[in-house]
Amino acid sequence: MDQKQIEEIVRSVMASMGQAAPAPSEAKCATTNCAAPVTSESCALDLGSAEAKAWIGVENPHRADVLTELRRSTVARVCTGRTGPRPRTQALLRFLADHSRSKDTVLKEVPEEWVKAQGLLEVRSEISDKNLYLTRPDMGRRLCAEAVEALKAQCVANPDVQVVISDGLSTDAITVNYEEILPPLMAGLKQAGLKVGTPFFVRYGRVKIEDQIGEILGAKVVILLVGERPGLGQSESLSCYAVYSPRMATTVEADRTCISNIHQGGTPPVEAAAVIVDLAKRMLEQKASGINMTR
């Protein structure tokens, strides 16, 4: 699916909701609008700032303008320079800072207060803590007994579409993108005339847990919004895993359709919501998902 198709879907879905489509967006580069990059090292520079990300470490370049343009065009680690065979101090410190940020978002917990503030029912997998979540992924694929009973008692049965939110491997991905993706997603699904289930939050969930959820609730389509494994310096990326009529015993990974890189520096959450609505409609029409869908 190319950018033009995405924009058409966004316009169509937003129009059906009676809202104006957002202007065509481009992935935001952290270095695009910053001041001219500097080459001198500074211990006072905030390593997470736009200035630090725009820093050029190549000394005495032949074409400084080329390096400046390259540095402004990407958030990748380019133009960092070397000192002999080693990276320069500022480049190394920024690498370590980004690594620390990514590690933190894996280990952090989604606050219970945040979940309550969103009005979400909270359930959990068979995992009891973060350490077990990281070492026993198999247990993150199944709901605990209390969660099963809670879903049966408090959630809409047999929905066309069931939306699930889970922390996954990035707490920031959920808390940062939630407000921009869930309201338009729920509104778009309802506007499409679909029976939408009760959205809820699964703590310590893995992707395959959506199979059990779909089976318990009798959902035709299950949409799981889950935090992606963070990259260096990028801890806010969300993924959507959608599957048609999932079953614990028979559903395999090829049956899922994935939309990844949902964040302000990738696919904007509002655009992603419109694409997910269109995807759910096509899944219901074709009664398929993943590689079984016709393109």
Swiss-Prot record:
Coiled-coil positions: none
Gene3D superfamilies in alphabetical order: 6.10.140.690, 6.10.250.2060, Ethanolamine ammonia-lyase light chain (EutC)
EC number: 4.3.1.7
Sequence positions that bind adenosylcob(III)alamin: V207, E228, C258
Classification via Pfam families: EutC (PF05985)
InterPro entries: EutC, EutC_C
GO process annotations (BP): amino acid metabolic process; ethanolamine catabolic process
Task of the protein: Catalyzes the deamination of various vicinal amino-alcohols to oxo compounds. Allows this organism to utilize ethanolamine as the sole source of nitrogen and carbon in the presence of external vitamin B12.
PANTHER family (alphabetical): ETHANOLAMINE AMMONIA-LYASE LIGHT CHAIN (PTHR39330), ETHANOLAMINE AMMONIA-LYASE SMALL SUBUNIT (PTHR39330:SF1)
Protein name: Ethanolamine ammonia-lyase small subunit
